[in-house]
Amino acid sequence: MALPSLGQDSWSLLRVFFFQLFLLPSLPPASGTGGQGPMPRVKYHAGDGHRALSFFQQKGLRDFDTLLLSDDGNTLYVGAREAVLALNIQNPGIPRLKNMIPWPASERKKTECAFKKKSNETQCFNFIRVLVSYNATHLYACGTFAFSPACTFIELQDSLLLPILIDKVMDGKGQSPFDPVHKHTAVLVDGMLYSGTMNNFLGSEPILMRTLGSQPVLKTDIFLRWLHADASFVAAIPSTQVVYFFFEETASEFDFFEELYISRVAQVCKNDVGGEKLLQKKWTTFLKAQLLCAQPGQLPFNIIRHAVLLPADSPSVSRIYAVFTSQWQVGGTRSSAVCAFSLTDIERVFKGKYKELNKETSRWTTYRGSEVSPRPGSCSMGPSSDKALTFMKDHFLMDEHVVGTPLLVKSGVEYTRLAVESARGLDGSSHVVMYLGTSTGSLHKAVVPQDSSAYLVEEIQLSPDSEPVRNLQLAPAQGAVFAGFSGGIWRVPRANCSVYESCVDCVLARDPHCAWDPESRLCSLLSGSTKPWKQDMERGNPEWVCTRGPMARSPRRQSPPQLIKEVLTVPNSILELPCPHLSALASYHWSHGRAKISEASATVYNGSLLLLPQDGVGGLYQCVATENGYSYPVVSYWVDSQDQPLALDPELAGVPRERVQVPLTRVGGGASMAAQRSYWPHFLIVTVLLAIVLLGVLTLLLASPLGALRARGKVQGCGMLPPREKAPLSRDQHLQPSKDHRTSASDVDADNNHLGAEVA
């Protein structure tokens, strides 16, 4: 960044002096975490050309909230406001619209919605909330339908959407929310739809419901209060015998001075058919337990935002990854966390003890009575007795909570959505890769090494308006992540390997999708070939892979420059040598020749080195980055003069050279004028101004003690006698004898003014 232009007189040097004296010490450090959790190594701002992105939008459409990937991975189905779209995502770049079918709310429903005091500009529409693949020929969709939920089947023909028939639209109550702002979830399992949403217009009746298929329709019982009235559902994940629902609600088992929100996981059995006499058309296998995501000794992250399942070869080792925030703000900022929960731990908790409500004390305690058979939530095939169902009605809350493993904790950010995949490195090890959408429209790519905490590879600002990410859909076959926003859909390639221009930078990135190809000398997407590519996911140290091996390893070794940029000095000017900060995790310093430039003596502005041409300033200047214990030159300059050229160091003879122009700032006249000019006036002016500054500082320091002394004097003067009257008011009045006046503390107001009240 170029400096402001300086004048042609002695004031030029004064401005340089004050620039160094006042501005440079106030600049923020180049890097550092500041206790906010892991920092993204690379950050891309909105519109940055170094990160290839593509954006799909359709005129007249808003709220691209619901995303569904086809079975072959080539089509992305999108549920927007009053429309369903089919996008072709086979080719890189902007997704291509295959076709679109409208599904607006009827005019009658919109009129009724407005009559109920809802906005006909933002609320009384059909927001698509459920979009699942029913079979090879049909999709199943549900929407808010102007606060009157509706569902329908959408026929497919060669992945194209056929128009919706009005007579095929069904009641969607219990499957889609009434209000578009209410959270919801739905999953299709074995032809049956399991949904969690709000079941009434007011949004005060949460429900878990099963519809479609051959099994009877089942739902939770609102009168038994299995769910709190403010329950908010975020995910539904099927397992072998059960379906898990993830949600948050106000806790009823804790006595707290304020409402405490708790994240939960609930289960229902797939083979549940309801009760015969008790709990007819109701779940008989409903259980719920608390989810705990917290660091030791810290407040828990108690509000769940999203959850996904990462399948494994064995279901017993599969894990659920969930995003949490906290209802408390520590340090005035929001925080987020990602925790992993084992399916084995969830199953163990649901096989443990129950809690029961003591009706006398209205407190939840551990149930210590005898077990009933069949055990509630056991998914037994036989019918349950009335005794077992009666027990189940009151014992639906588990005593133990499911403890998650914190993988990523970061303050100053609110994660809203999550997508997870497993990536295999060159060494064959598997690494969890998480894509995290934020409330400000950015996307974080995080990697979880084996038995370690996550680190952030990059941060990409998608939305220029900082609006939240509404949905994420991973498309592994296309190597991309799709992010839904109110105005459209962003396509984000899941890796950006080409931005790493050297083996050092490629290895330090520790991106499992990228590796260095020594033949093409490019950082490229990792393929299934067995080429001798370079990658170090475990250590991320270029000394092990970018050199000939561990024998060449040296703890103080610095790699040679790959390119030297030649710069010619100009008399009477300030030379600015820029240093691009490729990594936010590195620390940077400048060196001149083989010596490190002291930070105290160097003039560095925003990472750039400022040089005033004079004798001895020529030669090799390098901006050196140190990351993960490894130092490497980010940029190298050979500063030379036209009048007195320097000979290049023989060790740098084989390094390519390039003549470049760098920013210059004029500070004086010609060379001959500068040589004849005396700097005595400059010294006097600087000395006088510095004395004025010091005098002002001393005045400020002395002002506070003097003010305190004056205030003390006013307080001490409050006890003085008031002046006597010089003459009586009338002839009948006589002078009263003098009394000893004493003033109480209450006789002095906040401004040390005497109130005139006397105390005998």
From Swiss-Prot:
Reported phenotype of the disruption mutant: Results are contradictory; one study finds no visible phenotype; mice are born at the expected Mendelian ratio and are fertile, but they present defects in T-cell differentiation and in T-cell responses to antigens. According to another publication gene disruption leads to degeneration of photoreceptor cells in the retina within the first month of life.
GO biological process per UniProt: angiogenesis; axonogenesis; negative regulation of angiogenesis; positive regulation of excitatory synapse assembly; positive regulation of inhibitory synapse assembly; regulation of cell shape; regulation of endothelial cell migration; semaphorin-plexin signaling pathway
Membrane spanning stretches: 683-703
Presence of the UniProt keyword Transcription in the record: no
Protein family: Belongs to the semaphorin family.
Glycan attachment points: 120, 135, 496, 606
UniProt membrane topology term: Single-pass type I membrane protein
Organism name: Mus musculus
Region (Disordered): 720-760
Designated name of the protein: Semaphorin-4A
Lineage: Eukaryota, Metazoa, Chordata, Craniata, Vertebrata
Cytoplasmic-facing ranges: 704-760
Residue stretches making up the PSI domain: 496-547
Tissue: Expressed in neurons and glia in the developing hippocampus.
Annotated Gene Ontology cellular component terms: plasma membrane
Keyword Cell membrane: yes
InterPro entries: Ig-like_fold (IPR013783), Plexin_repeat (IPR002165), PSI (IPR016201), Semap_dom (IPR001627), Semap_dom_sf (IPR036352), Semaphorin (IPR027231), WD40/YVTN_repeat-like_dom_sf (IPR015943)
Cystine connections: 113-124, 142-151, 269-379, 293-339, 497-514, 506-523, 579-623
MF terms (GO), sorted A to Z: semaphorin receptor binding
Subunit structure: Interacts with PLXNB1, PLXNB2 and PLXNB3. Interacts with PLXND1. Interacts with TIMD2.
Gene3D superfamilies xref list: Immunoglobulins (2.60.40.10), ligand-binding face of the semaphorins, domain 2 (3.30.1680.10), YVTN repeat-like/Quinoprotein amine dehydrogenase (2.130.10.10)
Keyword list, A-Z: Adaptive immunity, Angiogenesis, Cell membrane, Developmental protein, Differentiation, Disulfide bond, Glycoprotein, Immunity, Immunoglobulin domain, Membrane, Neurogenesis, Signal, Transmembrane, Transmembrane helix
Residue ranges constituting the Ig-like C2-type domain according to the UniProt record: 572-630
Subcellular location: Cell membrane
